[in-house]
Each structure stands twice: as C-alpha cells, then as structure tokens.
Amino acid sequence: MQNADPKELAKFSELAHKWWDPESEFRPLHQINPLRLNWIEQTVGKLDGLKVLDVGCGGGILSEAMAQRGAQVLGIDLAERSLKVAQLHALESGQTRVEYREIAAEALAAEQPARYDVVTCMEMVEHVPDPASIVQACSQLVKPGGWVFLSTINRNPKSFLLAIVGAEYVLKMLPAGTHEYAKFIRPSELLRWCRDTGLDLRHTRGMEYNPLTRRYWLSADTSVNYLVACRKETA
C-alpha cells in the first residue's frame, strides 16, 4: 500500500500545468525557493558534485535549482502529471543533471539504501497519511554522514490562522483546501521521528512572510513554517 492520499495526488495533478508559472498557485514555492536552496547549500558547504534526492519533487522547482548548482539530482513523486511537467521543463531548460521517477520514497529506500549525499523533502510530509514513514525512508536513503532537509508547517492556533485562514481564504495565495490542519506537524513530532531513524538534528529555522511586501525570510520563529537540517549518524 502506497503512503499517499489519492485526494492529495489528484489536487496537485489538476494544477500540474501551472507548476512553472510564478504568478500561479505555486507562486509561494517560487518565492521561497532561493531561500531554501541557499540554506541547504550553506549547510552542506556546496552542492556541486553531490548526489541529491528530492522526495516529493512536484514540478521540479527545487530539483532543477539544485541541479543548476552542480548536483546530480533525482526527483521522485507519485503525481504522474507533475513529473511530466518537471521532465518537460528540464528538457526545455537543457538541464541534464536532473532525472525524475514515479516511485514512493519507501520503495526507493529498499532499492537504493544509503545512496545519496543529500536528501530533501520540502513542503511534502504534511500531505501524506504516514509522515513518519517518509522520514524513515529519507534516513535510509542518505549515506552515513549525509544530510536530510525537511520542511513543513507547525500545528497550533497561529499556524491555522496564518497558513489556512490567511493564506487560503483571505490572501488567496493558495487554493482553499490545499492544507489540512490535522496533518500539520509539530517540531517535537518531526524531531522524534528523525531521532528514531538515526538522524541527528543540526539546525532548525522558521520561515516568515510579510503580505504587504510579499517577502519571505528565514528566522528563529518556527511557529508556522519551519525547516530542519539533520545529519545521518555514522556507524
């Protein structure tokens, strides 16, 4: 049984043709991409020459950006239409350092254990039935001493007001129904799953947004959107 919600896959498949439109529903992802990309590269040192896996890659916004920094990237997702958009965009961009596969993280972990220097799973774990299983797969896929980067949304009244009411219904930055509050993940929960799978927390950052300036920035405030960087324990 795949660790995926058919409703979530259908939701993103319907929007697949808009992945690379920076003025579409995916505008927030385009806006935060430089922030998360730079944070990843600053943490790792450099991406050039590294083998990177992007779990839940969608249309390839982050995957392709990491390939542009010199990484050899594999993006995986279970939304077929999104993957086709990602493949087409890479072809049109002449980007040969990125490949895409329709496969679950758990299945790839069984096939390619300890294969990657870096594993990213951004804005994805809050969309699956069993996020702990995704974290475990990421841990299995990364090499000992390698890095795993995760980002998601905290679960509290503030995140409900800002990430759902504000973003989806007031500012209409995202389609209504993009997120389910019950699927939001507290940092304590995410970090417990990381520890249980041999991942050592190294850095945590929050991501904030000013609707007046339409600007995102990283901060110490993890009450809504947040990112974590973990390192796989060595034997």
From Swiss-Prot:
Record flagged with keyword Transferase: yes
Domain of life of the native organism: Bacteria
Sorted UniProt keywords: Methyltransferase, S-adenosyl-L-methionine, Transferase, Ubiquinone biosynthesis
Residues the entry annotates as binding S-adenosyl-L-methionine: R36, G56, D77, M122
Pathway info: Cofactor biosynthesis; ubiquinone biosynthesis
Annotated GO MF terms: 2-polyprenyl-6-hydroxyphenol methylase activity; 3-demethylubiquinol 3-O-methyltransferase activity; polyprenyldihydroxybenzoate methyltransferase activity
Keyword Methyltransferase: yes
Record function comment: O-methyltransferase that catalyzes the 2 O-methylation steps in the ubiquinone biosynthetic pathway.
Family: Belongs to the methyltransferase superfamily. UbiG/COQ3 family.
PANTHER family: METHYLTRANSFERASE, UBIQUINONE BIOSYNTHESIS O-METHYLTRANSFERASE, MITOCHONDRIAL
Entry-linked NCBIfam families: UbiG
Name of the featured protein: Ubiquinone biosynthesis O-methyltransferase
Record organism: Leptothrix cholodnii (strain ATCC 51168 / LMG 8142 / SP-6)
Lineage of source species: Bacteria, Pseudomonadati, Pseudomonadota, Betaproteobacteria, Burkholderiales
